Amino acid sequence: MSSQLESEASFEATTLGFLRRQFTRPKPLPAGITLDGQVAIVTGSNVGLGLSVCKQLLQLGLSHLVMGVRSQAKGDVAADQLRKSFPSALISVWIVDMESYDSVCAFASHCESLDRIDIVILNAGLIKTPYTVAHATGNEVTLQVNYLSTALLTILLLPILKAKKAGGGSRPPVISIVGSDLMYQNEVELKGPVLPQFQQEETFSQFSWYGRSKLLQTLFVSKLAEFVDLNDVLVNVSNPGMTGGTDFFRGYPALVMKLIAVGQWILARPVNVAATTYLDAVLVQGEKSHGSFTSDWTIKPYPKLWYTPEGQELKERLWEETMEELNFVGASRIVNDLKS
């Protein structure tokens, strides 16, 4: 449905568009939603938005929660807190380090052991300063975590979800990749290779690169959806908006943190409110969200670049580069096999 919203794309890139999104009134979930018997996977789930959406899924009766975390110790602490509130639920803590392809592959392989998977929320992400390289891959970490490893995990999980889809008239499983409306304000060079642009340390800007990495996510998902039957698995991008009360900006200089805190005090959503956008993406929007960008409890347009011939060329070029980068797992074969 995002593909049909070109007329709204320019406005979303403006300051007024941002303000309208931030002050949109939250929409409650429809009555009667229950997740009894269902299994959900949430990455980046030991703090902030990830932990909040875990709690909300459990409040809806989720039977089995898999928390994908980088630190076993921190994950166990968060899981123990949840177990005290939801003693009847099974809560597992599995390691996934998004800076490592090997860790991502191991996590996906672990997911094959589950009897079913109904919901996947890929929430793990970062905004990093200074310029840092992921030692396991040699890629800049913003690109690695927010885009490449997230794309890899999505591709690896899709056939697993398709194979484990519940029978009968149940809704298809959903993968929602957490994006950002910062993509509306950031672009990449339209000519030449896309991924190498993130290896140019001299052009590094943490906020810009974060927004650009989220732009790549949305371009990728819009293309990926062409290979995935919406009756098998739904895949979308969900934007929580500016959110206060998280550790997202940890490690920044004190002055920067103070400025961010002021901005968040004025504009940001509470964590528990922002997390409901994830629930909306996986439980409410349904098939119209397939391949789309969800934000503020509705479907929003892609960035205006997407609707141009240049944007479509960029999408195709990014896709080819991504398939080449992930060729070590046979990404192209996996994606093409989804059609069968």
Predicted regions, residues:
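NAD(P)H-dependent oxidoreductase Rossmann-fold/reductase module
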Residues: 1-114, 118, 127, 186-340
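Redox-cofactor binding/interface segments in oxidoreductases and associated redox assembly factors
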Residues: 42, 122, 177
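Glycine-rich, N-terminal phosphate-binding loop of Rossmann-like dinucleotide-binding domains
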Residues: 44, 124, 146
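Hydrophobic positions on the long internal alpha-helix
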Residues: 104, 121, 149, 153-157, ...
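Conserved catalytic-site loops of classical short-chain dehydrogenases/reductases
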Residues: 118-119, 171-179, 236
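Short alpha-helical oligomerization interface
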Residues: 127-145
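Glycine-rich NAD(P)-binding loop of the Rossmann-fold in SDR/ketoreductase-type enzymes
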Residues: 141-149, 212-213, 269
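Amphipathic alpha-helical dimer-interface segment in Rossmann-like NAD(P)H-dependent oxidoreductases
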Residues: 145-169, 183-186, 225-226
